[in-house]
Amino acid sequence: MKITINNRYMALQGLFWMLFCVSSGFISLYLQGRGLGNAEIGTVTAFFGILAALLQPLLGGITDRSSRLTWRNMILMLAIPYLVICIVMPFVPGAWAGAVFMGLLILLGNTMMPFINSANFYYSYAGEYINFGVARGIGSGLYALLALVIGVLAEKFGVEMVPISGILIALLFILVVFRMPSTKEPVEKAPRVKGLEKGFLLRYPAFTLMLLACLLMLTTHNILNTYLLQIIQSLGGNSSQLGIALAIQAVVEVPVLFGFTKLLKRFRPRTLMLTAAIGFALKALMYALSSSVFMIYLIQVTQMISFALFASASVFYTSEAIAKKDQTTGQAYMTSMMAAGTVLGSLSGGWILELSGMKAMLSVNVIIALLGVCFAFMSVRNIGLRRKV
């Protein structure tokens, strides 16, 4: 049976989201196990999130301008250090050593993301068939499976099972990246206009408004994800139930992602982005009203109309809103909002939780989500607005 580029891209997405599960899904569990408090966890996550937010557009712009640096080379340059860190982590004790290592995993994982998405368009522009929705759905399915496994293993053997799991996943991921072929018709690097990077956001005002909406969506998303363990513990749960909750929210993404191609035939990406913003607000409100771990399990179903829609719609929205010559830069700006959302969500959530408690954190989270809806609506209303350059 011939292994197509589409099959390999599915493997790439699947293994990438398993790597993402190792770092972002279990950061609170790992750092709590190493002895850090909520505010310290938030500060660590925020610091490395800031670095990722700065690196993503920078590396995206360099890749767009370079004829030698490709998305594939950039992924390898980030994935190999990820593997090395996972190997070293179990052998280096100490709370802050663990914090630095886990922070670096978050930095590397977030910085890889725009290049994973760019690979889709690289092959598509060269005439290769890529089913992004199915590939991203496989990513969610494998994220769910790994979340269950790590949750059980961490409860039984301790938190060092988090980086140990990362070793195997990173090895497989690097192997798949090496096996991703070059296309017969490489995508040409478009000529760059002097001063292009400086004026990027000014030239795409509707896109910039949507970036602000995404920042707020991902802030509320990261408040809930980063402190999901603490939310579950406040309701009497443990790390095993954290794994179940993470698995549920990943599994319910799969039908939406698998069927995303059909959704695109009926709705514009910008409409789906607005719907996702409303979904994030609904999820935030329901979390604020939750009273049991079982309710948390039920609320995770709202992932279908929030992050699941966002995960694919943001990629296609960027492709639609941004000129071809700026695609990698545009994707990098979009995915940098995930890193920036990690910063705001982890930092604000950690300090509010430490100083004012769970109820205050979840209430502020609702306000942030509603502001995200407002900016998404403003962007959709101004979609035709462009600056002449």
State the predicted function of each range:
Residues N38-A39, A126-I138, S239-S240, I322-M334:
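Loop-to-transmembrane helix entry/capping segments in MFS-fold secondary transporters
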Residues N73-I87, T271-M286, V366:
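Structural signature of the two symmetry-related core transmembrane helices
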Residues V162-F178, M361-S379:
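Symmetry-related core transmembrane helices of the 12-TM Major Facilitator Superfamily/SLC fold
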Residues G103-I138:
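Cytoplasmic helix-loop-helix junction between adjacent transmembrane helices
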Residues L55-R68, A154, V256-R268, L353-E354:
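Helix-to-loop junctions at the C-terminal end of transmembrane segments
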Residues K2-G49, A206-A245:
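Helix-loop boundary and gating motifs at the non-cytosolic
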Residues G14, A95-M113, L215, M295-L309:
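Hydrophobic core of transmembrane alpha-helices in multi-pass small-molecule transporters
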Residues M1-I3, M180-L212:
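Juxtamembrane intracellular "pre-TM" segments in multi-pass secondary transporters
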